[in-house]
Design a protein with these regions (language model features):
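Long beta-sheet-rich domains in secretory-pathway and surface-associated proteins
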Residues: 1-170
Length: 171
Protein backbone atom coordinates (compact mmCIF):
# COMPACT_ATOMS: atom_id res chain seq x y z
CA UNK A 1 0.00 0.00 0.00
CA UNK A 2 2.79 2.49 0.68
CA UNK A 3 4.01 2.09 -2.93
CA UNK A 4 0.67 3.22 -4.39
CA UNK A 5 1.27 6.17 -6.68
CA UNK A 6 4.96 5.45 -7.19
CA UNK A 7 5.89 4.86 -10.84
CA UNK A 8 8.35 2.09 -9.91
CA UNK A 9 9.44 -0.09 -7.06
CA UNK A 10 12.34 1.20 -4.96
CA UNK A 11 15.76 0.01 -6.13
CA UNK A 12 16.81 -3.27 -4.49
CA UNK A 13 20.37 -1.96 -4.15
CA UNK A 14 21.18 1.69 -3.53
CA UNK A 15 24.32 3.65 -2.79
CA UNK A 16 24.81 6.60 -0.47
CA UNK A 17 27.95 8.68 -0.99
CA UNK A 18 29.07 11.74 0.93
CA UNK A 19 31.69 14.08 -0.54
CA UNK A 20 33.38 17.12 0.86
CA UNK A 21 34.43 19.87 -1.52
CA UNK A 22 35.97 23.08 -0.20
CA UNK A 23 34.50 22.45 3.22
CA UNK A 24 30.97 21.75 1.97
CA UNK A 25 29.47 18.27 2.34
CA UNK A 26 27.44 16.82 -0.52
CA UNK A 27 25.40 13.66 -0.33
CA UNK A 28 24.40 11.60 -3.37
CA UNK A 29 21.83 8.83 -3.15
CA UNK A 30 20.82 6.59 -6.02
CA UNK A 31 20.27 3.09 -7.33
CA UNK A 32 23.15 0.81 -8.30
CA UNK A 33 23.05 0.57 -12.11
CA UNK A 34 24.97 -1.19 -14.83
CA UNK A 35 25.10 -0.31 -18.51
CA UNK A 36 24.96 -2.48 -21.61
CA UNK A 37 25.23 -1.47 -25.24
CA UNK A 38 22.62 -2.59 -27.73
CA UNK A 39 23.62 -2.20 -31.41
CA UNK A 40 20.20 -0.71 -32.23
CA UNK A 41 19.07 1.02 -29.03
CA UNK A 42 22.47 2.23 -27.82
CA UNK A 43 23.34 2.36 -24.14
CA UNK A 44 20.77 0.73 -21.85
CA UNK A 45 20.84 1.21 -18.08
CA UNK A 46 19.48 -1.44 -15.72
CA UNK A 47 19.26 -1.72 -11.97
CA UNK A 48 21.32 -4.41 -10.30
CA UNK A 49 18.70 -6.93 -9.15
CA UNK A 50 18.42 -9.11 -6.09
CA UNK A 51 16.94 -12.22 -7.65
CA UNK A 52 15.85 -15.69 -6.48
CA UNK A 53 17.74 -18.72 -7.87
CA UNK A 54 14.82 -19.37 -10.25
CA UNK A 55 11.33 -18.12 -11.05
CA UNK A 56 8.19 -20.07 -12.01
CA UNK A 57 5.92 -17.95 -14.19
CA UNK A 58 2.57 -19.43 -15.30
CA UNK A 59 1.98 -19.24 -19.06
CA UNK A 60 -1.64 -18.31 -18.21
CA UNK A 61 -3.12 -16.92 -15.02
CA UNK A 62 -6.00 -19.42 -15.10
CA UNK A 63 -6.69 -22.94 -16.34
CA UNK A 64 -10.06 -24.67 -16.76
CA UNK A 65 -11.01 -28.24 -15.97
CA UNK A 66 -14.03 -29.04 -18.15
CA UNK A 67 -16.30 -31.94 -17.09
CA UNK A 68 -13.71 -33.48 -14.79
CA UNK A 69 -10.92 -33.53 -17.38
CA UNK A 70 -7.44 -32.43 -16.27
CA UNK A 71 -6.62 -28.73 -16.56
CA UNK A 72 -3.24 -28.12 -18.22
CA UNK A 73 -0.92 -25.84 -16.24
CA UNK A 74 2.24 -24.70 -18.03
CA UNK A 75 5.02 -22.95 -16.10
CA UNK A 76 8.04 -21.11 -17.53
CA UNK A 77 11.03 -21.80 -15.28
CA UNK A 78 13.88 -19.30 -15.60
CA UNK A 79 17.27 -19.47 -13.86
CA UNK A 80 18.33 -16.44 -11.85
CA UNK A 81 21.87 -17.75 -11.42
CA UNK A 82 24.24 -20.29 -12.96
CA UNK A 83 23.91 -23.99 -12.14
CA UNK A 84 20.30 -24.26 -10.97
CA UNK A 85 19.20 -27.82 -10.14
CA UNK A 86 15.83 -28.26 -8.58
CA UNK A 87 12.34 -29.62 -8.68
CA UNK A 88 9.17 -27.76 -9.68
CA UNK A 89 6.01 -28.62 -7.73
CA UNK A 90 2.39 -27.54 -7.89
CA UNK A 91 0.77 -28.15 -4.48
CA UNK A 92 -2.99 -28.78 -4.72
CA UNK A 93 -5.81 -28.86 -2.13
CA UNK A 94 -6.83 -32.14 -0.50
CA UNK A 95 -8.79 -34.35 -2.91
CA UNK A 96 -7.25 -32.79 -6.02
CA UNK A 97 -4.77 -34.67 -8.23
CA UNK A 98 -1.69 -33.32 -9.99
CA UNK A 99 0.39 -35.22 -12.53
CA UNK A 100 3.35 -35.36 -12.34
CA UNK A 101 3.96 -34.70 -8.65
CA UNK A 102 7.22 -32.88 -9.48
CA UNK A 103 9.24 -31.91 -12.55
CA UNK A 104 13.04 -31.99 -12.21
CA UNK A 105 14.87 -29.08 -13.85
CA UNK A 106 18.51 -28.36 -14.53
CA UNK A 107 19.55 -24.99 -15.96
CA UNK A 108 23.22 -24.32 -16.71
CA UNK A 109 23.33 -20.52 -17.06
CA UNK A 110 21.49 -17.55 -15.56
CA UNK A 111 18.68 -16.63 -17.94
CA UNK A 112 18.22 -20.18 -19.27
CA UNK A 113 14.59 -21.29 -19.47
CA UNK A 114 12.61 -24.50 -19.59
CA UNK A 115 8.96 -25.47 -19.33
CA UNK A 116 7.25 -27.55 -16.64
CA UNK A 117 3.86 -29.03 -17.54
CA UNK A 118 1.27 -30.32 -15.09
CA UNK A 119 -2.23 -31.78 -15.39
CA UNK A 120 -4.50 -30.80 -12.49
CA UNK A 121 -7.73 -32.71 -11.84
CA UNK A 122 -10.18 -31.31 -9.27
CA UNK A 123 -12.65 -33.58 -7.47
CA UNK A 124 -16.30 -33.50 -8.48
CA UNK A 125 -18.10 -30.41 -7.16
CA UNK A 126 -14.90 -28.58 -6.25
CA UNK A 127 -14.74 -24.79 -6.27
CA UNK A 128 -12.02 -22.82 -8.04
CA UNK A 129 -8.64 -22.81 -6.30
CA UNK A 130 -5.52 -20.65 -6.46
CA UNK A 131 -2.38 -22.76 -6.65
CA UNK A 132 1.14 -21.61 -5.74
CA UNK A 133 3.77 -23.24 -7.98
CA UNK A 134 7.25 -23.41 -6.50
CA UNK A 135 10.75 -24.55 -7.34
CA UNK A 136 12.86 -26.23 -4.69
CA UNK A 137 16.54 -25.27 -5.05
CA UNK A 138 19.11 -26.37 -2.46
CA UNK A 139 16.36 -27.38 -0.02
CA UNK A 140 14.51 -24.05 -0.15
CA UNK A 141 11.22 -23.44 -1.99
CA UNK A 142 10.94 -20.31 -4.17
CA UNK A 143 7.57 -19.17 -5.50
CA UNK A 144 8.02 -16.04 -7.62
CA UNK A 145 6.79 -15.09 -11.07
CA UNK A 146 8.77 -12.69 -13.23
CA UNK A 147 7.49 -9.97 -15.54
CA UNK A 148 9.94 -7.94 -17.64
CA UNK A 149 8.88 -4.49 -18.84
CA UNK A 150 11.17 -3.55 -21.73
CA UNK A 151 10.39 -0.57 -23.94
CA UNK A 152 12.93 1.67 -25.71
CA UNK A 153 11.76 4.88 -24.02
CA UNK A 154 12.04 3.70 -20.38
CA UNK A 155 14.61 1.76 -18.34
CA UNK A 156 14.10 -2.01 -18.26
CA UNK A 157 12.12 -3.03 -15.19
CA UNK A 158 11.74 -6.50 -13.71
CA UNK A 159 8.77 -7.10 -11.44
CA UNK A 160 8.77 -10.11 -9.11
CA UNK A 161 5.42 -11.19 -7.67
CA UNK A 162 4.18 -14.29 -5.86
CA UNK A 163 3.59 -17.07 -8.40
CA UNK A 164 -0.06 -18.07 -8.62
CA UNK A 165 -2.34 -19.86 -11.06
CA UNK A 166 -6.10 -20.28 -10.66
CA UNK A 167 -7.74 -23.58 -11.63
CA UNK A 168 -11.46 -23.35 -12.35
CA UNK A 169 -13.61 -26.51 -12.59
CA UNK A 170 -16.50 -26.24 -15.08
CA UNK A 171 -19.37 -28.74 -15.27
Amino acid sequence: PKLIGDPRQPAPLAINATFEVLGHAFRLDGPVLYATTDPVRGERLREVLVFPPATVTPARDAAMSVNGKPAPVVLRVRAGRDGVKGSVTLPVPAGWRVDPAAVPVELAKAGDETTARFAVTPPSGAAAASLRPAIDVDGKAWSFREHVIDYPHIPVQVVLQPAQVRVVPLQ
